[in-house]
Swiss-Prot record:
The CAAX motif is a signal for the geranylgeranylation of FBXL2 and is required for its association with cell membranes and the recruitment of substrates to the active SCF(FBXL2) complex. Pathway: Protein modification; protein ubiquitination. Residues 9-55 form the F-box domain. Coiled coil: none annotated. Keywords: Calcium, Calmodulin-binding, Host-virus interaction, Isopeptide bond, Leucine-rich repeat, Lipoprotein, Membrane, Phosphoprotein, Prenylation, Repeat, Ubl conjugation, Ubl conjugation pathway. There is a cross-link at K201 (Glycyl lysine isopeptide (Lys-Gly) (interchain with G-Cter in ubiquitin)). A motif (CAAX motif) lies at residues 420-423. SUPFAM superfamilies: RNI-like (SSF52047). This is F-box/LRR-repeat protein 2. The keyword Cell division does not apply. The gene is FBXL2.
Amino acid sequence: MVFSNNDEGLINKKLPKELLLRIFSFLDIVTLCRCAQISKAWNILALDGSNWQRIDLFNFQTDVEGRVVENISKRCGGFLRKLSLRGCIGVGDSSLKTFAQNCRNIEHLNLNGCTKITDSTCYSLSRFCSKLKHLDLTSCVSITNSSLKGISEGCRNLEYLNLSWCDQITKDGIEALVRGCRGLKALLLRGCTQLEDEALKHIQNYCHELVSLNLQSCSRITDEGVVQICRGCHRLQALCLSGCSNLTDASLTALGLNCPRLQILEAARCSHLTDAGFTLLARNCHELEKMDLEECILITDSTLIQLSIHCPKLQALSLSHCELITDDGILHLSNSTCGHERLRVLELDNCLLITDVALEHLENCRGLERLELYDCQQVTRAGIKRMRAQLPHVKVHAYFAPVTPPTAVAGSGQRLCRCCVIL
């Protein structure tokens, strides 16, 4: 919309400044910047710090340099509560020091992928940003234990911290962190490959409010560490153990006996887990909603039977590469409360014993939205077609190898690839 000078002047006369500011508060960054170009009056209103409490620069990441962050911090000052610099690789320590000095009321800061920053940034946040509650340092690979020591001393209100792929972090950094930040509710440590069981012992001792913990690819973790977490963090609702290949049923037993509120469990590639462990888990964790059991190669239909009986809230289940699962297990799942009412996503890639019979059973899952069937060699196009006639809204992803074409005759038309079919 384009305003003439008369239109803009009329709006300014009819509406008080306070109401215009309120209207501007609902606009995104781009629209605010456009409004700032209308007139001097609107420039002042649009760039008022109260309109810039939440800023996400992800869409402009390639253009954001340090001076942009510095200018924003000077403009917003104490108004700014939430800033996302995700992917802004041009932003470094110096700019974030200026930001921290100017925006001392910041509560939510996303620095995911800001690879230039070092411990110096965390020192600045510790010194000036005591109200910080949410901090994402994903892939800030220069971050060390010194950062965690600084954060623990100055950011004691922290509730969410993402340190994924900060692979210099060790148990000493975790100990320093949790001693100061005892109110942590979510701690994401994906790819922190130096962490061992002792780090989890420190978390157990101090983080009793913890609700979400991600240990994906922390390959040194064993049952001992998971048992300690379970004994100290009874409020745990989401736990990712994918890629922790040393774990056995002892970890599932500890979860079942200590964490009844568990809703999300990711245990992909934990190939030592068996039906016995999942049986105990299912019988005690009735709130489970999402489970990733990809490549839990020892589980059988017995696990599905227990989940069907005891986990009525299950919405998403990955069984990819669980090659012992059969149509009978899918029958129990489909006939259960979760199958009838809750199940939305089911992944059965490379479940070689699954046939079209399983698809007939899944017709009972009226809420099913997505079904993965890649490399299920006994599933046919006809079977999928019959199921989709009953569940037309479901998205089925499958792959069928192309039929070997006859030898081409010289001069024949162009051959077409018909193997990649998404149904």
